[in-house]
């Protein structure tokens, strides 16, 4: 099979490409240039698609003896991931850019181009498993499982995907990389949002959106507890950095409950007010009929809770048997039957 291996410059994608070669496939490596920021060209820079990442990917391809190319998808990434990220925060939502990148870049822009060039599949270093029938499952490594950020992919996207690492732990991948003499064997994992390398999401958004001051209101008393420079810098469930000028009347900690972009108002309240028992998701991938008992996951590294999911018109309604705390519109909800992904969508509204 002629396959395209997406090589980020990290250890996972390098070993995934190596395993594709071992499986007898005709493999070509490609590194995605997703940023035109001058910072990404600086030696030692961190973040999205730095020059060092491209070099690491090329070195790995050379060791594997496969052709290697760099594809410039910066404009597409800006439009489909970064702009959507900014617009979501400006609208009071909390997006997951990794989910969006998989939906629109790796398994849309890259996959479409790969198929047009005659490749039959795209290989990535995601920690997830795919059955021959296209069923997506969790990785055997629960700490590194990435099925959540893949859980909103459509069946036709999964049909052309290959995840060679799903049956291995991250420790095993690193050992294998060292045995193959890949220089990235000990390269640290990336944890930040890739295009916000310094980790200050609020500051990065402020540069894009400018100051939009407003009040911080207590939901219990209606009192103004403080002021902020931009509601977009907050997320539902946040406790730290609320800029409260006075304590709440009951003396208890306060958490962000709601964000109103129209009035630039941030509403805070006690922790129990964050409990969510019902989610409505759109842009859903849900091929099931009727009410389905399942397990729901609403964060990339969160746990699961029992739920019942049912399609309603173009929406997916998820009722949680056990409430989850601090779930925000914009996040993904992915639904499981054991380790099997049933489908998912993007949370539009939540309810207590």
From Swiss-Prot:
* Residues annotated as the enzyme's active site: 101, 194
GO CC terms for this protein?
cytoplasm
Q: Which UniProt keywords apply?
A: ATP-binding, Cytoplasm, Disulfide bond, Nucleotide-binding, RNA-binding, Transferase, tRNA processing, tRNA-binding
Q: Which reaction does it catalyse?
A: S-sulfanyl-L-cysteinyl-[protein] + uridine(34) in tRNA + AH2 + ATP = 2-thiouridine(34) in tRNA + L-cysteinyl-[protein] + A + AMP + diphosphate + H(+)
* Sites annotated Interaction with tRNA: 126, 331
Decide whether keyword Ubl conjugation is in the record: no
Which example biological process does GO assign this protein? tRNA wobble position uridine thiolation
Region of interest called Interaction with tRNA, as start-end residue ranges on this chain: 144-146
Q: List the disulfide bonds.
A: 101-194
> Where in the cell is the protein located?
Cytoplasm
Q: Which domain of life is it from?
A: Bacteria
Q: Which residues bind ATP?
A: 6-13, 32, 125
Name the CDD domains for this protein: MnmA_TRMU-like (cd01998)
UniProt-listed Gene3D superfamilies: Adenine nucleotide alpha hydrolases-like domains, HUPs, Translation factors
- Cite a single GO MF annotation: tRNA binding
Identify the EC number(s). Answer: 2.8.1.13
Q: Name one Pfam family in it.
A: tRNA_Me_trans_C
Q: Which family does it belong to?
A: Belongs to the MnmA/TRMU family.
Q: Which NCBIfam families match?
A: PRK00143.1, trmU
What role is this protein assigned? Catalyzes the 2-thiolation of uridine at the wobble position (U34) of tRNA, leading to the formation of s(2)U34.
Task: Indicate what this protein is called per its UniProt record.
Answer: tRNA-specific 2-thiouridylase MnmA
